[in-house]
Amino acid sequence: MNDTVAGVIAKALARHGVEIIFGQSNPSALMLAAEDIGIRQILFRTENAGGVMADGYSRITNKISVIAVQNGPAATLAVAPMAEAIKASIPMLVLVQDVPTHARDRNGFQEFDHLALFASVSKWTRTIDDPARVDDYVDLAMMVANGGRPGPVVLLLPKNVLDLEAHPAKLPRTANLGSFPLDRPRPCAQAVAKAAGLIAMARAPVVIAGGGVHVSGAVQALVRLSDRAHLPVATTNMGKGAIDETAALSLGVVANITGRSGPAFYTRDLIADADVVLLIGNRTNENGTEGWSLTKPDAIYIHIDIDPCEIGRNYEAVRLLGDARAALDDLTIALEGLDLASRAAARPALEARIA
């Protein structure tokens, strides 16, 4: 006998490395099927709390988190943590029990337009209503959530469809797509060479690292680049921790705390003096740039990001489109072939100024 749709979803989640689901026992058919194969449920009291739990789990494990919620009012409570996750580039799979297909568009119990509800906080929202395509949709959800710039996705699960017999896949699937970054694309070699040349020739270059450094797992790559090219590193609030804040070349957290009464006021001049600014996984948002006033308008910008729409959004830049860790590794290698004597000579005075 074939599995039910709920059973196939549970097995697909397990194949992608899912070990826990944050939930409240809904959808019941799915939660029972998941329990049967060893996927644990971690309970939450409210969906907004469950979403925060899921977000934290993803950040710690570099695996997609899964949260299951009921339709309607319960689903609305998942919006706030999803909004945080999509801005912070954190993958999350939200499974929403929906009204049965025969009740759709008939004012079924707690029926809600979930496509409209999640439009601004989900990378991708789909309904599983074809028992022959369950694996397709679970795999697509994983690819969209963990691929490119990670973020939340939603699968809507009509209650009656979960109990239907699912058609077996024609070929067994073995791919595990449940961790991120799913891929590590590298930037164009010519752009990397150009960026390396600009850094080598710069009078006062600076790095401003954003949250993308953490998402990419690029902390060590950033440390290597900073040490090799003698680059001072500041971070945004989301990038905090990307470099040891007691390190000799660390400028700490900057952005909206560099005002006259802010704790980072005394690093402001170092940022403002930069002639080359390397942005890494940095959305250059208002808070992260103190209203786009932190750096000189005529500075040269180099921007590493996985999202092509973020590069050049606020500052025209040399485009290093790709995974942050891969890009930093390539940039460090490119710099090894260049003369960095002037950067090395300037380092003692720079460290003294930072101290």
Residues covered by each model-derived region:
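Short glycine-rich anion-binding loops that position phosphate/pyrophosphate groups of nucleotides
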Residues: 26-28, 70-74, 98-99, 159-161, ...
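Phosphate/pyrophosphate-binding active-site segments
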Residues: 1-4, 132, 298-355
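Active-site-proximal loop->helix
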Residues: 56, 99-120, 245-250, 315
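Glycine-rich oxoanion-binding loops at beta->alpha junctions
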Residues: 37-68, 124-126, 248-270
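Active-site nucleophile and cofactor-binding loops and adjacent substrate-binding regions
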Residues: 24-26, 42-52, 67-74, 129-131, ...
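Glycine-rich, anion-gripping cofactor-binding loops and their flanking helix/strand elements
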Residues: 59, 211-302
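Structural signature of the thiamine diphosphate
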Residues: 2, 19-20, 59-96, 119-172, ...
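Cofactor-pocket helix-loop regions in the catalytic cores of large enzyme subunits
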Residues: 1-27, 31, 132-133, 156-248, ...
